[in-house]
């Protein structure tokens, strides 16, 4: 089993990382750090540019999470996925036998999340795994 974390370096994602590390360590499970972003198109230069940006930006984000996981002594797998974050997380939850999916929130209103389809909101409705939504810290 594993703890699947959606990570993008936002304040909410950083808070979610701390919770996911705690859960993985307490349960003796592997942490799967997922960075997913949807491609703008499926052909040509636009798709190639997207893949390059995914590897660069997503790779940097994942490396930061991986460093924290290693410092905490948690076995970690990383996944860069060219798909909408919700789809990426559900796909990786299935692939890695998730016990829970952990995501951060960024303080949006529930109505805005429902209308715009935020990742946490959509996961709560689509996931067959438990979803832990961790709020971003309050601004100082």
List each model region and its residues.
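Short glycine/serine/threonine/alanine-rich loop segments
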Residues: 29-30, 74, 98, 129
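Small/aliphatic-rich secondary-structure junction motif
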Residues: 1-47, 52, 77
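Structural beta-alpha unit
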Residues: 67-101, 138-140
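Short, hinge-like loop/turn segments at secondary-structure boundaries
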Residues: 49-52, 95-97, 119-120
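A short acidic, glycine-rich active-site loop
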Residues: 49-61
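Glycine-rich, Arg-bearing micro-motifs that act as flexible, cationic patches
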Residues: 100-125, 139-140
């Amino acid at each position: 089993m594993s703890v699947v974390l959606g990570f993008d370096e936002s304040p909410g994602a950083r808070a979610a990382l701390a919770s996911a590390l705690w859960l993985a360590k307490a349960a003796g499970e592997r942490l799967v750090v997922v960075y997913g972003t949807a491609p703008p198109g499926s052909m040509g230069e636009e798709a190639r540019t997207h893949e390059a940006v995914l590897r660069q930006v997503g790779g940097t984000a994942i490396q930061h999470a991986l460093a924290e996981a290693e410092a905490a002594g948690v076995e970690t797998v990383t996944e860069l996925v060219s798909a909408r974050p919700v789809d990426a997380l559900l796909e990786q939850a299935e692939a890695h036998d998730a016990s829970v999916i952990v995501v951060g929130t960024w303080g949006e209103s529930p109505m805005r999340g429902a209308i715009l389809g935020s990742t946490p909101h959509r996961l709560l409705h689509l996931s067959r795994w438990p979803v832990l939504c961790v709020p971003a810290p309050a601004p100082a």
